[in-house]
Amino acid sequence: MKKILERSMEGSGTWQGLVLVGIVTWICASSYLKFTHKFRSLLQPWVARQVVGGVPLILRIQKCQNGVLDAFFSGLSCVVSVPFYTAFLPLLFWSGHGRLARQMTLLIAFCDYLGNCIKDVVSAPRPSCPPVRRITATKDEEDNAMEYGLPSSHTLNTVCLSGYLLHYVLSSLEYESVSIQYYGFALACLLVALIAFGRVYLGMHSVVDIVSGLAIGVLILGLWLTVNEKLDDFITSKQNVSSFWTALSFLLLFAYPTPEHPTPSYEYHTAFNGVTLGIVTGVQQTYSQFHHEAAPRIFSPELPISSYLGRVMVGIPTILLVKFCSKSLAKWTLPMVSNALGIPIRSSMYIPKLKGYASGKKTDEPKNSVGYLQKLCEFLSHDSFDIDTGIRFFQYAGLAWSVVDLVPSLFSYVNL
């Protein structure tokens, strides 16, 4: 048995190293060979023509506009948005459904990363407004409108998450029921259809965006249903998980493609990348205590609704406090570390004194004193790095870690 475990650990370390080396190789090769620019020059003109050609169909759909439909589709878009899922995930973890919550977190992160990468590689426009009427009922929708169009993230996410949730529910049933499978599948398809139609009705996407989001979502869902059990087993029971995921998260920040013009997509990815790291490291450390399959679940005698509401009342203020503290700590430490390592930095939001310029070594110092990290910056065509990326990453990593580690420890302490 001991030899088997040792071989498993060696094999795990080998593929982890290969994954990280592969990402580093991709970063260097794509930067040097300008893959993003080449892919964009091939895809963007065709997609732009499809978007322009789809405007008459959008206008015909919007002829049936009224206040009820505006409110319905706007509300539906909010319910299936990434911020909504992010707010919902802590409640799912605290309800005792740890495996479902882990898989939903990782799946959202994967969909968000891949979808936003494709958006920024293609850099295809959304339908022109006017003549299309674009409805942005919330600040989140206004931010979404600033992103590129293809693929539709709402459609992609809905396909993946509703499909996985259906799979989870059906696999959890004690007996198979054809009628439950049929109605569950029909309900998932109805939700996807409403989301897809709503994105066109709201003027946020053209048909080509919807179709691409649907196709990519189906491919991701098929892949996820194949690997989800192995991935969950790796996170909960293997070695080097935290160190591997930390390195992976760091490299994914560099592997993200550069869009034609800046959009909020990279900020969304950074935040959820931090969330994923916090969840993975926290679960890996406390799985046997709080997140195992025998953990009490909501509505069971061990976790009645009153205790669950108590968890929510304790947990929500705690994670918000941790987020604030993580942000403050990152704002204090990251600039000092960057300056000590000779990394040129700037801030567009969090640190006013760094706005609009790079801070680092003085310009009259010899150039060979900046070290390899600054040479890496120059190789990746960055004059400086936005320190806000690191601050955003660490505050969301701290928030997510508190959801699965600190807060469950508090629950145990106060008998919730």
UniProtKB/Swiss-Prot annotation:
Active site: H154, H205
Site residues by UniProt (Stabilizes the active site histidine for nucleophilic attack): D209
GO cellular component, one term: endoplasmic reticulum membrane
Residue span of region Phosphatase sequence motif II: 151-154
Transmembrane segments: 72-92, 104-124, 178-198, 207-227, 241-261, 266-286, 302-322, 393-413
EC number: 3.1.3.-
KW Ligase (keyword) present: no
Domain of life: Eukaryota
Alphabetized Pfam families for the sequence: PAP2
Keyword Nucleus applies: no
UniProt GO molecular function: hydrolase activity; sphinganine-1-phosphate aldolase activity
Cellular localization per UniProt: Endoplasmic reticulum membrane
Function: Functions as a sphingoid long-chain base phosphate (LCBP) phosphatase. May play a role in the regulation of LCBP levels and be involved in stomatal responses through LCBP-mediated ABA signaling.
The protein's name in its UniProt record: Lipid phosphate phosphatase delta
Taxonomic source organism: Arabidopsis thaliana (Mouse-ear cress)
Gene label: LPPD
